Amino acid sequence: PESRTVLQQLRFRNNLVRARTRIANSLVAIALSCGAVRRFSVLTTKGRRRMAALKMSEEQAWQRDRWFEFLDGLEPVITEVERKLEAEAKKDPRVCRLMTQKGVGVLTGLALVHVLGPPERFATSRKVAAYVGLDAVESQSGQRRHIGRISKQGSRLLRFLLVEAAQTSARCDPELKAVYERLRRKKTHATAKVAIARRLLVRSWILLRDQIDIDEFRRRGRARCGVKPGQPEETHGL
């Protein structure tokens, strides 16, 4: 019941944010049709002033005002849901442990804990990746084996949050940044980003399974690779 409630809140928040994005895009479309040279954020005070300064027809102005009314109604609801989720995260040591990994915030941490459930039910990292749909689909033609796109089974919400988190991790986590840059030389940005999301997922599963934080995870990685404290870290698998 607890996991169901948290996941319902996460999905509700996600739907609200998607609605806000659709409204913002509709407002930008009005701005562009009224002579705006480039896209701009309509979610800021400055953006609203720019919208108000544009010359537009009476009908366009009416639509603009209605869209802003919808936005004004959404914002406090999004804020309220996010406060509930933050409170839930703060009291859960599992989420706090996951958030020691750069890129994993409140939303991703909660989704990981409540989608995966007990970490011991997954025997291997491949089973975790398959459960979330971040495993590569294999096909065979004659003597050739082809590894294609991810299967996209399981929780769409968790996959989305992990891919979003991967963008931050690829910038802020030295190990994952090195992996991303290496992959980016051979693959597309999207492929590299999904690969980082998969590594984040497996790391998170290990943190949950072993009840450790990211510092202990790295210490174990250095020990496994024979790297002494103070030496430059090499990427070590995950």
Question: Can you describe what each PLM-predicted range is?
Answer:
Residues T5-R97, D173, R218-Q231:
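Glycine-rich, often acidic, oxyanion-interacting loops/wings at catalytic, nucleic-acid
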Residues L10-R20, A24-L32, V113, V163-Q167, ...:
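Short, amphipathic alpha-helical segments that act as regulatory/interfacial helices
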Residues A19, I23, F70, V104, ...:
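Hydrophobic (often cysteine-bearing) scaffold residues that line and stabilize catalytic clefts
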Residues I23-A24, I78-V81, G117-R121, Q167-E175, ...:
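Short helix-capping/linker segments at secondary-structure and domain boundaries
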Residues R97-T100, V106, A111-A190, C225:
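Phosphate-backbone recognition surface of nucleic-acid-processing proteins
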Residues Q143-I147, V179-L238:
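Low-complexity, acidic/Ser/Thr- and charged residue-rich accessory regions of DNA metabolism proteins
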